[in-house]
């Protein structure tokens, strides 16, 4: 099973996160399938590769809680079909 989750980057006390598609059994810093976004909580900046995110969501990937909140704020779920909005 694939999840969309955050992968920590940056230095000490200045964390930034990559949003990655990763296998459930991998650890947080493990090898990802694909990088699909970027999130900086300090500057409150977000970059999302929406076509890649939609591809993984259509294939059955489950976003974690934090990633789901980021995607809701960016209104990514509105681009999914009405039969695939099980994340709202």
UniProtKB/Swiss-Prot annotation:
One of its GO terms (cellular component) is chloroplast. GO terms for molecular function: structural constituent of ribosome. This is Small ribosomal subunit protein bS16c. The keyword Oxidoreductase does not apply. The gene is rps16. GO terms for biological process: translation. It comes from the Eukaryota. Its main location: plastid. It comes from Helianthus annuus (Common sunflower). It is found in: Plastid, Chloroplast. Belongs to the bacterial ribosomal protein bS16 family.
